[in-house]
Amino acid sequence: MKYLGIDYGTKRTGVAASDTGGSMAFPRRTIVMTTRDRFFAELLAVAEEERAEAYVVGLPLLHDGTDTLTTRQVRNFVERLKRRTTLPVYLMEEFLSSYEAEDDLRDAGLSGRALEAVVDQQAAVRILQSFLNLPESRRTPA
């Protein structure tokens, strides 16, 4: 099964895709938020280009598992996505994926605009790869 991983943000959203076997995640693009309609049009177009069969959205939680403002924004995004697609949508709990991706990219020598261009994609890769590493029995659609 092919999955599309999403690191949702109100300004930029990172997108990753799995291989067709659903075992490895790869960065695909960063979608910059302009209008909601354009954002969803671009996201759905990426899903079609990739022939995705499901979405995996990172759900940021605090250490103790409680929601934050960002968690609520992601949940709202997921509800809007589900109204626009027939594909299943999965939530993957995550903590600090964007910060960890940024640290890794800085260690690789990226900074400034070069870093900004790919950090959200790398966070999406982390989210999707974590999901792909789960046993299928632990994957439940939102």
From Swiss-Prot:
EC number in record:
3.1.-.-
Q: Which cellular components does GO assign to this protein?
A: cytosol
- Spell out the molecular function terms from Gene Ontology: nuclease activity
Where is the chain membrane-spanning? Answer: none
Q: Which SUPFAM superfamilies match?
A: Ribonuclease H-like
In terms of SMART domains, this protein maps to: YqgFc
Looking up Gene3D superfamilies in the UniProt record yields: YqgF/RNase H-like domain
Which enzyme class, named as a word? hydrolase
Question: Where found?
Answer: Cytoplasm
- Mind listing the UniProt keywords for this protein, alphabetically? Cytoplasm, Hydrolase, Nuclease, Ribosome biogenesis
Q: Name one Pfam family in it.
A: RuvX
Tell me which Gene Ontology terms the entry assigns under biological process. rRNA 5'-end processing
- Please list the coiled coil stretches: none
The family line of this record is: Belongs to the YqgF nuclease family.
Matching NCBIfam families? RNAse_H_YqgF (TIGR00250)
Q: What does this protein do?
A: Could be a nuclease involved in processing of the 5'-end of pre-16S rRNA.
The name this protein goes by in its record: Putative pre-16S rRNA nuclease
